[in-house]
Design a protein with these regions (language model features):
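Iron-associated oxidoreductase/ferritin-like identity signal
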Residues: 1-165
Length: 165
C-alpha cells in the first residue's frame, strides 16, 4: 500500500501543479499560505483510508465551489480547466472508497491484506512533472512533505502486520 500511496503523492503533486500553472499562465500570482500539518498517526490502515476519503470529499467540495465561482464570473478558461478535475474527483473518491471497503471486508486477515498490497503495488507511475516547472521550491516541498506522511505510515503498518503474524 505504501507503493500505491507513493504514486498517489505524484498524482496529487501533478494536480496541484495544474492549478498553479493555470493561475500563472493567466497572469495571476500564487500566494502560498501556511498549511496545517497533517495527521501522522492512525490506529489502522482502515482508518487511513477512511480519513483519506473524507479528505478527498472535502477537496471535491472545494473544487465544485471554485467551479461555481468560475461560472458566476463567466470564466470559461477556468471552467474548461476544472472539467478535467470533475472527472478526476469521481475517480479519486471511487478508488479510495474501494480500498476502504476491501479493508473493511478483510478485517484482520493477513493473507488478504498481503494480496491487496500486492495488487496495489502493481500501480504504474504517472509521468513525472515537467522539469521546467516554475513553482517555488517551498510550495513543492510543502506538498511532498504532507503527502509522504501517508506513504511512511503504510510502510510502518505493513511491517507491523507482517511481524505480528
Amino acid at each position: 500500500m505504501a507503493h500505491w500511496m507513493e504514486f498517489q503523492v505524484q498524482e496529487e503533486y501533478a494536480q496541484a501543479m495544474r492549478f498553479y500553472r493555470h493561475v500563472v499562465e493567466r497572469g495571476g500570482r500564487v500566494i502560498l499560505k501556511e498549511i496545517r500539518a497533517p495527521k501522522t498517526k492512525w490506529s489502522s490502515l482502515l482508518e487511513v483510508f477512511e480519513d483519506a476519503l473524507v479528505h478527498e470529499s472535502e477537496v471535491t467540495r472545494r473544487i465544485h465551489k471554485i467551479g461555481e465561482i468560475a461560472e458566476e464570473e463567466g470564466d470559461r478558461a477556468a471552467q474548461s480547466m476544472l472539467s478535467w478535475f470533475y472527472d478526476e474527483r469521481v475517480e479519486e473518491e471511487a478508488q479510495i472508497g474501494e480500498i476502504r471497503d476491501l479493508l473493511k471486508m478483510i478485517g484482520d486477515n493477513l493473507a488478504a491484506l498481503l494480496h491487496i498490497d500486492a495488487k496495489l503495488g502493481a500501480r504504474v507511475p504517472m509521468s513525472p512533472p515537467p522539469a521546467e516547472s516554475t513553482a517555488p521550491q517551498r510550495f513543492l516541498r510543502a506538498i511532498k512533505k504532507r503527502l509522504k506522511s501517508l506513504a511512511r505510515f503504510f510502510r510502518q503498518q505493513l511491517r507491523t502486520y507482517v511481524t505480528a503474524s
